[in-house]
């Protein structure tokens, strides 16, 4: 099971996970009859507050290989349980709840389960709420938070800090974000709606934010050296860009026997758009898989007797990686034999 370094998660989903998930339901109102004496139909909103385990599991799904429709194929329940440090039974029970709240749908497959993150396509709609980037190492820290309300608050801080990005662009000195007591009461359970409890929940510190409660407001700022998902991904983009260009040069040297690609023949075959595509593939499949597939492609395209012109390096690399992953998947033991 491939886990991406960064996940794109809808801001509306983060908002609901840190608060309540709304599910709309049509009911008959027998106290309000129509002209024919029949009960009228009213739409009501049900509010569901997810558990820590359910929140973690839905976020985790975003780190798997999700296509543009929100579909993830052949996921091992055993591997999900291992990643979240829970039982397979918990994974299955969580899926039932997530499906009931219409956040996911799922079905069994020969290699495990197929999952659809229902609202995923809406993250990228022009008039939607947008998405934020979350790094997997940050997610690993979040799921270690024991108190579910502290987890909800930390997710809300991620959301607020990301939303404050535009404000910081105009005034870099304004790097502090805040959550007022009134805002806090909107997304937390009623039994936490007093300042002493808010103070206690906010005391949970992580590597990302330095948090201080002053009066009735939670103030927080990124710790020195810490980066949010958007900043970390930009840094990784630059690293991967350099790594891919170096890999192209090193592959030429190894296959040609020359000390360097002095004429730039090989590098000139790769346009900036090609490098950008390979960087994106590195986020999806990992830089080492991309470099391995790149080596095979360069060998076939430039150093074999039946070499052919490659017009789409990104598409070709993706195909090579998928073939290798498909081969590995075929060798796996069916999930039914390993799950309990």
Label the predicted regions.
Residues 1-79, 86, 99-101, 110-179:
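Short recognition helix of helix-turn-helix/winged-helix DNA-binding domains
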Residues 91-95, 99, 106, 144-340:
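Electrostatic interaction modules used in gene-expression and signaling proteins
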């Amino acid at each position: 099971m491939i886990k991406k370094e960064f996940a794109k998660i809808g801001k509306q989903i983060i908002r609901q996970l840190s608060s309540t998930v709304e599910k709309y339901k049509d009911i008959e109102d027998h106290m309000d009859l129509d002209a024919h004496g029949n009960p009228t139909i009213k739409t009501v909103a049900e509010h569901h507050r997810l558990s820590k385990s359910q929140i973690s599991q839905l976020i985790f799904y975003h780190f798997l290989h999700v296509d543009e429709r929100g579909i993830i194929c052949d996921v091992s329940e055993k591997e999900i349980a291992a990643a979240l440090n829970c039982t397979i039974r918990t994974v299955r029970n969580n899926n039932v709840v997530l499906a009931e709240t219409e956040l996911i749908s799922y079905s069994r497959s020969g290699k495990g389960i197929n999952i659809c993150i229902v609202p995923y396509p809406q993250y990228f709609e022009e008039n939607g709420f947008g998405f934020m980037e979350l790094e997997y190492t940050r997610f690993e820290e979040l799921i270690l938070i024991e108190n579910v309300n502290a987890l909800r608050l930390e997710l809300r801080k991620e959301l607020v800090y990301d939303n404050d990005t535009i404000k910081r662009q105009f005034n870099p000195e304004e790097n502090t974000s805040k959550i007022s007591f009134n805002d806090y009461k909107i997304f937390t359970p009623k039994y936490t709606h007093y300042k002493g409890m808010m103070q206690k929940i906010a005391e949970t510190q992580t590597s990302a934010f330095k948090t201080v409660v002053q009066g009735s407001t939670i103030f927080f700022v990124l710790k020195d050296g810490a980066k949010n998902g958007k900043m970390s991904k930009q840094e990784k983009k630059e690293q991967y860009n350099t790594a891919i260009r170096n890999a192209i040069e090193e592959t030429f040297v190894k296959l040609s026997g020359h000390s360097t690609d002095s004429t730039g023949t090989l590098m000139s075959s790769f346009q900036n758009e090609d490098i950008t595509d390979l960087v994106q593939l590195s986020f999806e499949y990992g830089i080492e898989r991309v470099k391995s597939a790149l080596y095979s492609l360069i060998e076939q395209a430039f150093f074999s007797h039946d070499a052919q012109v490659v017009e789409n390096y990104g598409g070709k690399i993706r195909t090579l990686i998928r073939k290798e992953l498909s081969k590995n998947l075929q060798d796996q033991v069916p999930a039914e034999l390993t799950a309990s």
